[in-house]
């Protein structure tokens, strides 16, 4: 029923546009006035500023799909060592030979196989120091709190073992979630005072694991149910106390926070960076604790098999797909978008002589964004035009980026890249 409604709505819109378009006998009528996709070609030739306008439309479209008003302001990015280590260890991406992060685009491959793809976000939140000592603070991104189901959530901790340690002794690492202490519970308040929390917070064991203390390595602690409860309560701050009773005896220690880069005085009373990190400091930064969360909400999608559309190669004058790539580095966005390196903002152009065939309203998302952007700018090629050559197949796009809170987010965005074009 929703699909039929969308088709009906599209036909009504097309009918209104056709009724408002100039008649075939109108003076100055041309093939350009028959279809906005034809006007795209004309615009690129007649309007010198068309490419900058297209780029601006693409930027607005990406921000809209990521539910952002403006691009995040990155003042203190996560150290590259920590970023590369986190993405290397998780399935959100891999590090290429050149040191850049490449997204593992599983969602795109699934879309090619016509599988139902659910909108998901994979979020990496690096720990901040908490109170009291040995407490980690995670500020979960708003992106994660808006999604309904936590597929899994894990805290990653690095256990560093002294080279002199030859013991086979295992140590038990425990994670306690700290929460505000309810009023009126005097007995619990006394217990908190014994733990040095002054009765302000209670804590609950949320994960524990016995690990081998013979080698330095990462350890994963699942806390999915705890994060789900936290989000269900409308909260986004997670405080976790880390306990390891036998670590000191076995010569092992948990890297709870990477060492910060030292500051130096520049002689004028201002601080400046104190040079490059040492090898040990670089290693500490790469072992910074983090929380990895995969969250989702289902979105019904229906797929239909279609014949592959035409590519615009300069030799065809019927409805086809025009390739248009926007490099994030060229537009100054590479500081907050980790991967991919750019966006294939393909669109549809050329003439469409065939009759109207209904398509899903969601399929028009990007095409309509570009057309409306030009129409609002008052470019004459788009005045009183009827839509005809439109996307008939789109695929998702995976993005890895920083939000304003310096969290790393991997988001699979539906209907982002035009794959095929056809006549509506």
Swiss-Prot record:
* Gene Ontology MF annotations: cytokine activity; growth factor activity; hormone activity
Q: Which residues form the propeptide?
A: 21-308
Identify the PROSITE patterns for this entry.
TGF_BETA_2 (PS51362)
Q: List glycan-bearing residues.
A: 165
User: What does UniProt give as GO cellular component?
Assistant: activin A complex; extracellular region; extracellular space; inhibin A complex
Q: Do the record's keywords include Secreted? A: yes
Q: So which residues are the signal peptide here?
A: 1-20
Provide a GO biological process annotation.
Answer: regulation of follicle-stimulating hormone secretion
Cysteines paired by S-S bonds? 312-320, 319-389, 348-421, 352-423
Keyword set for this entry?
A: Disulfide bond, Glycoprotein, Growth factor, Hormone, Secreted, Signal
Q: How does it assemble?
A: Dimeric, linked by one or more disulfide bonds. Inhibin A is a dimer of alpha and beta-A. Inhibin B is a dimer of alpha and beta-B. Activin A is a homodimer of beta-A. Activin B is a homodimer of beta-B. Activin AB is a dimer of beta-A and beta-B.
Entry similarity comment: Belongs to the TGF-beta family.
Name this protein carries in UniProt = Inhibin beta A chain
Native species: Gallus gallus (Chicken)
**What is the primary gene name for this protein?**
INHBA
């Amino acid at each position: 029923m929703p699909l039929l409604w969308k088709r009906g709505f599209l036909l009504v819109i097309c009918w209104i546009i056709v009724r408002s378009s100039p008649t075939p006998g109108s003076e100055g009528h041309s093939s350009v006035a028959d279809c906005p996709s034809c006007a795209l070609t004309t615009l690129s030739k007649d309007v010198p500023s068309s490419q900058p306008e297209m780029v601006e439309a693409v930027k607005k479209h990406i921000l809209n799909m990521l539910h952002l008003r403006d691009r995040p302001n990155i003042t203190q990015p996560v150290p590259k060592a920590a970023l590369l280590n986190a993405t290397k260890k998780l399935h959100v991406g891999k590090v290429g030979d050149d040191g850049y992060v490449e997204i593992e685009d599983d969602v795109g491959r699934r879309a090619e196989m016509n599988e139902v793809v659910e909108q998901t976000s994979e979020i990496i939140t690096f720990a901040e120091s908490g109170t009291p000592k040995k407490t980690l603070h995670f500020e979960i991104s708003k992106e994660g709190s808006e999604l309904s189901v936590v597929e899994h959530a894990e805290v990653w901790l690095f256990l560093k073992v002294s080279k002199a340690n030859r013991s086979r002794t295992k140590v038990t690492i425990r994670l306690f979630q700290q929460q505000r202490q309810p009023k009126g519970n005097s007995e619990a308040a006394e217990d908190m005072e014994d733990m040095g929390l002054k009765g302000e917070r209670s804590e609950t064991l949320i994960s524990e694991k016995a690990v081998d203390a013979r080698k330095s390595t990462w350890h994963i602690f699942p806390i999915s149910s705890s994060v789900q409860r936290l989000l269900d309560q409308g909260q986004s701050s997670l405080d976790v106390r880390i306990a390891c009773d036998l670590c000191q005896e076995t010569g092992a220690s948990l890297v709870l926070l990477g060492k910060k880069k030292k500051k130096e005085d520049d002689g004028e009373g201002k601080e400046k960076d104190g040079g490059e990190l040492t090898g040990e400091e670089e290693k500490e930064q790469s072992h910074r604790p983090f929380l990895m969360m995969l969250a989702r909400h289902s979105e019904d999608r229906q797929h239909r098999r279609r014949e592959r559309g035409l590519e615009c190669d300069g030799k065809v004058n019927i409805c086809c797909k025009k390739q248009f790539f926007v490099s994030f580095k060229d537009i100054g966005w590479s500081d907050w978008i980790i991967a991919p390196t750019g966006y294939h903002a393909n669109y549809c152009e050329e003439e469409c002589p065939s009759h109207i065939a209904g398509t899903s309203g969601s399929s028009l998302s990007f095409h309509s964004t570009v057309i409306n952007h030009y129409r609002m700018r008052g470019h004459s090629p788009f005045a009183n035009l009827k839509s005809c050559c439109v996307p008939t197949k789109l695929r998702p796009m995976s993005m890895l980026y920083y939000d304003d809170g310096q969290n790393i987010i991997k988001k699979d965005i539906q209907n982002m890249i035009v794959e095929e074009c056809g006549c509506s």
